[in-house]
Amino acid sequence: MAKQVADYQCSKLQLYQKLALVVILGAVLFSLPALCAGQGNPSFKYSREANENFDPQKAPRAEHHHHHDHDHDHGHHHHGHDHDHDHDHGHDHGHHHHGHDHDHDHDHGHHHHGHDERHTKAKPDLDMSTIWLHSIGSTLLISAAPFVLLYIIPLDNSEAMKPRLKVLLAFASGGLLGDAFLHLIPHATHPHSHGEHGHDHGHDHHHHHDGEEHEHGHSHDMSIGLWVLGGIIAFLSVEKLVRILKGGHGGHGHSHGAPKPKPVPAKKKSSDKEDSGDGDKPAKPAKIKSKKPEAEPEGEVEISGYLNLAADFAHNFTDGLAIGASYLAGNSIGIVTTITILLHEVPHEIGDFAILIKSGCSRRKAMLLQLVTALGALAGTALALLGAGGGDGSAPWVLPFTAGGFIYIATVSVLPELLEESTKLKQSLKEIFALLTGVALMIVIAKFE
């Protein structure tokens, strides 16, 4: 007992030292916004156009162009009534001297062609090699920072750590649900804003296309909901399939059965010792037998952990897309996006680590598996940079499908752990507070984004 107390005090001292190191690193990291020179954050982060429209150096030129041509555009929709007046008005502006004798629709199309071309040919303020360096460096930073925190947190699946693990699991479920409902689904529902285009042509188009836009918006929202349900059903199907392939010996397949087999081998050991009066030879087979029941539930429990890794991989992929697209728009915007995603990922990765520990992974294995999900972020960053001229980087189904996976993991794999055993009132209050803290962090991050 005295040795355990001494070990606990020693580990506590090491924890304080590591926390001091993290505070210093955090102070250096959060000084980065000073480099952003007052740049705001884009309201949406998954498309390159969003970040380009946010560039203040390009905005004044685009605004001048829109206001200069406003009357010209407005006149085109009335050419059926006063064609001559509109034609002369366009000639007075001097935009299309060569188009004086041409069809009126030709001039209108030519105008829009120049408008679109100007937007697609907007260039970033850095060369591509520097953009690649900054984007990959930011992605590695986002992957490494949570890893340092995971190294500090003293956590395993032992009985002594069980109350602390349950609190972290509650925090993880709150983070997953908050991430799905407050971050992923809203971004999928409103992927980008058409503010500038709507400002130019609002007087002309809204009266004619309100019904069509309403129909389009309704079908889009329904498709988002279907993809969320598809994510939930897909994760359920994968877990069912894995259980069937494992031979059906996992009747209590979740971690409900993980602590319970431990007393069984103990009874076998004691009975073997009582039956064997002479030596240690009968005890060795008993030890070998006692390891087999422990391995079975561990394999069953790991299903939820690997499902969570798959969802986290897809989520990190979208974060990589955001980083690559933001650095294409400008270095300052890339730094702001990196800090935002880092604040989002730190609590998320801590929750994922707790889920892996509860799933039966060792501490070292859980940390290595968390690093594997960083490959998703690197792949997303590379895809955004390689498709630099391609507009939106992410498929429309990725975000809602990932949200469905997060909802499934939180409600099926994590929350049942909190109801597994009757806990004291104080422990239950801690778990509820941790869950609300996870949701609150996602609210703050969603507001900041």
UniProtKB/Swiss-Prot annotation:
Locate the transmembrane regions by residue number: 19-39, 135-155, 167-187, 222-242, 371-391, 395-415
Q: Where is the composition biased (Basic residues)?
A: 63-80, 249-268
Claim: Transport is one of the keywords in the record: yes
Alphabetized GO MF terms: enzyme regulator activity; zinc ion transmembrane transporter activity
Report the subcellular localization. Answer: Membrane
Which biological process, per GO, is one annotated for this protein? regulation of epithelial cell migration, open tracheal system
- Residue ranges, compositional bias (Basic and acidic residues): 81-91, 100-121, 193-218, 269-283
Where are glycans found on this sequence? Answer: N316
Q: Where is this region: Disordered?
A: 57-121, 188-218, 247-299
Q: Which domain of life is it from?
A: Eukaryota
Q: Which GO terms describe its cellular component?
A: axon; endoplasmic reticulum; endoplasmic reticulum membrane; neuronal cell body; perinuclear endoplasmic reticulum; synapse; synaptic vesicle
InterPro entries according to UniProt: ZIP
Which of UniProt's keywords are assigned here? Answer: Glycoprotein, Membrane, Transmembrane, Transmembrane helix, Transport
In the bilayer, the protein is annotated as:
Multi-pass membrane protein
Q: Which family does it belong to?
A: Belongs to the ZIP transporter (TC 2.A.5) family. KE4/Catsup subfamily.
The free-text function statement in the UniProt record for this protein reads: Negatively regulates tyrosine hydroxylase activity.
Among PANTHER family, the record links this protein to: ZINC TRANSPORTER SLC39A7 (PTHR16950:SF25), ZINC TRANSPORTER SLC39A7 HISTIDINE-RICH MEMBRANE PROTEIN KE4 (PTHR16950)
> Per its record, how is this protein called by name?
Protein catecholamines up
Species this protein is from? Drosophila melanogaster (Fruit fly)
| Gene of this entry | Catsup
